Amino acid sequence: MKLTVIGATGSMSGPESPASSYLIQARGIDPQSGGERVFSLVCDLGPGSFGALWTHVCPCELDALVLSHCHADHMGDIISLQVYRKWGPGSCALRPVSLFGPEETIRRVRQIEGATDDESYEAEFAFTHMQLGESYAVGPMTIRPFRALHPVEAFGLHIEGPAEDDPSRRVSLFYTGDTDLCDTIIEGARGVDVLLSEVGFTSDETEPDMHMDGLRAGTLATRAAVERMIATHIQPWTPRERVASEIRQAWQGPLEFATSGMEVSL
């Protein structure tokens, strides 16, 4: 399984990166052809991310889009994907791409496009409202949502799949989406190989039940006993040194910062 960071900037696209978007790929057996191929899912598709995604995978080859929640900085570019799937080259032959997300997902897509209430997007998207306690398969990968602590319905995402160097071995990643520190997010992240954690605030910017600062993100990594932490969703005006200093108050393990184009083999 491989993670490619498409966008990592918090709350908006920034001068060095699109907003939140993460490509996760793994090799598996195609149930239709019986042959092996690469399966591709994207977690979130924030502003500016669709064009950057295109440099890593053709939108026609995308197997699934998973939305952690429906704030615009995590899903604004979904309308670009919708336009491609409807009007792009060979679109008439494309099956609807799997779309997993909160209950309000399709309504939010309509709002972004300015579409009428009867627009279903059923030709472009096969939508599933994710349910806590359920799991969802995308090729050899399994997605499990965990309740996040955020002002809207939001999920942290536990994703498991085959290791890059040994497909018989399973590896795991947890993406927090947007959340404050809470027990359900700790549960979802427990023991994962990679924790992709938002750090939307610094300690002097914090509002409750919205984002984590570095201390709380570091606490998450420690309490969940993860192997490796990648900090993301940092505001474009926030110095990474400040974030690292806060994280290190609670986490002494491996720490990296997500950057657009960064690749991580699991």
Per-region residue spans from a language model:
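Cap/insert and terminal regions of metallo-dependent hydrolase folds
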Residues: D180-V264
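Binuclear metal-dependent hydrolase catalytic cores
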Residues: M1-Y175, D180, I185-E187, A244-L266
